[in-house]
């Protein structure tokens, strides 16, 4: 989900997404090198006018094209395994947010606070304000503190959904009867948008996610106001 004038990935808002960006660039560089090498060899063979009538086998080249791809795969697999481990590791979360997917809206529960839960629906186009984002704005945003370890629990009430915020590098499937979890830490304030990433019915495209990252003191004020209401 690109933003204005953005042809690549979104700017990262969490250390995990930053690691994913680095891994993307690392892997893309390897793929470009492979493409150039294979293209060069194909062109050389295509325009080569020499023939070897006595070639029976090429044991040396067979060993090379077996070992070389294995080494290249190691350079891709090891960073990938490291990031997969980091994505699953949860270190002493300060706040737990429970997310429930419905057809076609999200419900949120702040498990660490008393009676703090709400539903989040997409704002229809005819009710959207001038500075709103079409098909991305919601009536109730999630508000979470920045520079804080957050754990998110995701499930669903009807069919399979997927809670996804690209700027944070978070994508968790919500499956009825199961509770999936992941963690993230937002390192800058701002609004981060996401959408359901699992086809879940007719209005699958109309259940966006809006997460507001704010300093801790503003988050405490928001929590106090929500509890008083």
Swiss-Prot record:
Q: Which GO terms describe its molecular function?
A: copper ion binding; cytochrome-c oxidase activity
Residue ranges, Mitochondrial intermembrane compartment?
A: 1-26, 83-229
Q: Which SUPFAM superfamilies match?
A: Cupredoxins, Cytochrome c oxidase subunit II-like, transmembrane region
Q: Where are the transmembrane segments?
A: 27-48, 63-82
For this protein, the Enzyme Commission number is 7.1.1.9
Its cofactor is: Cu cation
Q: Which residues lie toward the Mitochondrial matrix compartment? A: 49-62
Recite the UniProt cofactor note for this protein: Binds a dinuclear copper A center per subunit.
Where, by residue number, does Cu cation A1 bind? 161, 196, 200, 207
Query: Which PROSITE patterns has this protein been placed in?
Result: COX2, COX2_CUA, COX2_TM
Primary location group: mitochondrion
A single Gene Ontology CC term: mitochondrial inner membrane
Q: Name one GO biological process term.
A: ATP synthesis coupled electron transport
Give membrane topology per the record. Answer: Multi-pass membrane protein
Sequence positions that bind Mg(2+):
198
Q: Which UniProt keywords apply?
A: Copper, Electron transport, Magnesium, Membrane, Metal-binding, Mitochondrion, Mitochondrion inner membrane, Respiratory chain, Translocase, Transmembrane, Transmembrane helix, Transport
Reaction(s) catalysed (UniProt annotation): 4 Fe(II)-[cytochrome c] + O2 + 8 H(+)(in) = 4 Fe(III)-[cytochrome c] + 2 H2O + 4 H(+)(out)
Q: Which NCBIfam families match?
A: CoxB
* Complex and partners: Component of the cytochrome c oxidase (complex IV, CIV), a multisubunit enzyme composed of a catalytic core of 3 subunits and several supernumerary subunits. The complex exists as a monomer or a dimer and forms supercomplexes (SCs) in the inner mitochondrial membrane with ubiquinol-cytochrome c oxidoreductase (cytochrome b-c1 complex, complex III, CIII).
Describe its function: Component of the cytochrome c oxidase, the last enzyme in the mitochondrial electron transport chain which drives oxidative phosphorylation. The respiratory chain contains 3 multisubunit complexes succinate dehydrogenase (complex II, CII), ubiquinol-cytochrome c oxidoreductase (cytochrome b-c1 complex, complex III, CIII) and cytochrome c oxidase (complex IV, CIV), that cooperate to transfer electrons derived from NADH and succinate to molecular oxygen, creating an electrochemical gradient over the inner membrane that drives transmembrane transport and the ATP synthase.
Q: What is this protein called?
A: Cytochrome c oxidase subunit 2
Recorded source organism is Simulium vittatum (Striped black fly)
């Amino acid at each position: 989900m690109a933003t204005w004038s953005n042809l690549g990935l979104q700017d990262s808002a969490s250390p995990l997404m930053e690691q994913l960006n680095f891994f993307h660039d690392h892997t893309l560089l390897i793929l470009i090198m492979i493409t150039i090498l294979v293209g060069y060899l194909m062109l050389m063979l295509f325009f080569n006018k020499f023939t070897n009538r006595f070639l029976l086998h090429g044991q040396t080249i067979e060993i090379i094209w077996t070992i070389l791809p294995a080494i290249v795969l190691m350079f891709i697999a090891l960073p990938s395994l490291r990031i997969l481990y980091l994505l699953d590791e949860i270190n002493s979360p300060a706040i737990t947010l429970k997310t429930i997917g419905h057809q076609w809206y999200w419900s949120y529960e702040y498990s660490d606070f008393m009676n703090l839960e709400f539903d989040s629906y997409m704002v229809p186009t005819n009710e959207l304000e001038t500075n709103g984002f079409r098909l991305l704005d919601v009536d109730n945003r999630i508000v979470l503190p920045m520079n804080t370890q957050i754990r998110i629990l995701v499930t669903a009430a009807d069919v399979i959904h997927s809670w996804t915020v690209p700027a944070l590098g978070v994508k968790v499937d919500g499956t009825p009867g199961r509770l999936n979890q992941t963690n993230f830490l937002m390192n800058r304030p701002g609004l981060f948008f996401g959408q359901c990433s699992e086809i879940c019915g007719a209005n699958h495209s109309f259940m966006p996610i809006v997460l507001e990252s704010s300093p801790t003191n503003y988050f405490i004020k928001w929590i106090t106001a929500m509890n008083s209401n």
